[in-house]
Amino acid sequence: DPSFSQLCDAMAAKNADEAFRAAHTLKGVSKNLSLTGLAYSTSNLTEALRGKTELTDDIDPLFKKVKKDYALTMACIQML
């Protein structure tokens, strides 16, 4: 699923609308796969981005948490 890389690209481009879409997609994928930690952090990021036209200061810590949870999730999957 390309949604994490799309989220990273959107955040780098400071595109709040694209970041919202990518975070929302990643949230859905995470929930469908029962990846609870990642689903929780992406849900928080999605709600913070909802309706935003630009990225605000509160977004960066939430995005950092998503990146951390994504890395942890991928590491766990690779151990299987």
Residue ranges and their predicted role:
Residues 29-80:
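Amphipathic, coiled-coil-like alpha-helical segments
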Residues 1-5, 23, 42, 59:
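Residue-level signal for cytosolic alpha-helical hairpin/rod architecture
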Residues 7-19, 33, 52-57:
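Short helix-adjacent coil turns
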